[in-house]
Amino acid sequence: MPLPFTLRQLEYFDAIAREGSLSAAAERCHVTATALALALDELERNLDLKLVVRRKGKGITLTAAGVTVLRQARQVLSGAEAFAAEAQQSATGLTGSFSIGCFPTLTPFFLPAAMERFAREHAELELEFLEAVTSELHEALLGGQIDVAILYGVDVSKQLEFEPIREYRPYVIVGEGHRLAGRGTIALADLGEDPLIQIDMRPSRQNTEYIFASLGLRPAIRHTTTNYELARSLVGRGLGYSLLVQRPAPSVTYDGQRVVNLELSDPLPPTVAGLARPRGAARTAKYAALREFLSAHTAV
């Protein structure tokens, strides 16, 4: 049974959705607006669906069916691109563009090695990266703006597949003058009413709240911040403690203060970081190579 569409028609439809007008999409695709309109008409006719609404002077908007078809079309196009890339692999390994998204608190621990060592090992790859919060990474993956995202295994969309690559044990940092700084290992309850400097980004905030709730504790939150290094600097100044997952190599904050890492004796589950991609998307050679590299070379 012949397919009711061509890849070219899907490419044109994707361009129309991105640009919001036939003329801009035609320029993007290097064809005439007439050719683009004919391709769209044929796609709608073959699918027996109304995909867009055309309003003179107001451009083009997608119908509800168009939104659904667009998401599926982008998955088909992504799979086709992956197929072409696999077929064209050079003897030296991987080629073409590869866009990686990453959650902000994970970025310093994953992306530098990827942008330097992984890129050097696969010199024909054109690496790009996007740093964004979880919801934006989900949208970028489903919209085809990035190929893969590095994020926590919390609140992952059901439209994505998540593959763990590293586990972390939560720990606490305190200033070097803190009364517990010399202990090495503590229970979270030992901090009592000490003020918490909380990382206020989803899912970091939710993970912190879950940890306290699972132990029957309620933190005394003093400050919240979306900036990982600001949290460390506030702790270094003796303004509270922070519950973290990643472990920077230096114990010195941006403003020259020292913080002390304290392990937690509480029976806490590990926090998982991994790779996400659209559900059903091809597991390309690029993806497999990145996964293998990050598993072996990621900073803790």
Regions found by a protein language model. Give the residues of each.
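Short helix-boundary/capping micro-motifs
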Residues: D14-T32
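A short LG(V/I)-centered, amphipathic sequence patch enriched
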Residues: E44-A64
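Interdomain hinge and pocket-entrance segments immediately C-terminal to HTH DNA-binding domains
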Residues: K58, A64, Q88-T107, E121-L125, ...
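Central regulatory/effector-binding core of bacterial HTH transcription factors
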Residues: T95-K158
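A late-sequence structural motif
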Residues: F110, V259-V300
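Hydrophobic hinge/microswitch elements
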Residues: V133-H138, L142-I146, L151-Y152, R202-V260
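Beta-alpha-beta core module
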Residues: K158-Y168, R183, D190, E229-R279
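Secondary-structure junction motif
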Residues: P195-L215, P250, R283-F293, V300
